[in-house]
């Protein structure tokens, strides 16, 4: 469920959406009934459209929850499959065979920094902080159940800053 929520959070963050519809949930593989268990993560609100019917509209309980889950999704996708969701060309899987894991992580971080800098309203700033924080060794230990490989180091973070 965490991976699906992360995918939803990332897709909606990229679109700049704070609210989303039931169809967005199903596109990310989230069953509404099963998701009700996670009612502390996102809430259902009702929005009346044209006065004819009520359409179910959802949002995360706080924007920072959406940004964290989006960063977690990007990080896990990259670590587990080598795909850089922030790359325009989506060729990270080819690059992963050419470079070491540390250089790839640097590439992911650089893509995130570039995207955040291109944002006119700074909507990716906290996402970037979460993404960089997920690569810290202390957090890798906490995420080991979700990660396939955890060979990251502090040197990668220093290279990103350079």
Task: Identify the residue ranges that each predicted region occupies.
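Leucine-enriched alpha-helical scaffold segments used for protein-protein interaction
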Residues: 1-162
């Amino acid at each position: 469920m965490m991976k699906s929520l992360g995918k939803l959070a990332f897709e909606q963050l990229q679109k700049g959406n704070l609210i989303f519809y039931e169809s967005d949930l199903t596109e990310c593989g989230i069953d509404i009934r099963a998701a009700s268990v996670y009612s502390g993560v996102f809430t259902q609100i009702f929005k009346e459209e044209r006065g004819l019917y009520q359409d179910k509209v959802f949002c995360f309980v706080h924007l920072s929850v959406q940004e964290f889950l989006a960063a977690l999704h990007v990080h896990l996708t990259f670590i587990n499959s080598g795909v850089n969701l922030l790359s325009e060309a989506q060729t990270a899987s080819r690059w992963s065979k050419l470079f070491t894991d540390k250089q790839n992580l640097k590439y992911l971080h650089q893509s995130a920094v570039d995207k955040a800098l291109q944002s006119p309203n700074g909507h990716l700033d906290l996402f970037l902080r979460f993404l960089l924080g997920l690569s810290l060794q202390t957090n890798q230990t906490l995420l080991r159940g979700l990660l396939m490989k955890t060979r990251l180091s502090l040197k990668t973070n220093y290279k990103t800053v350079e």
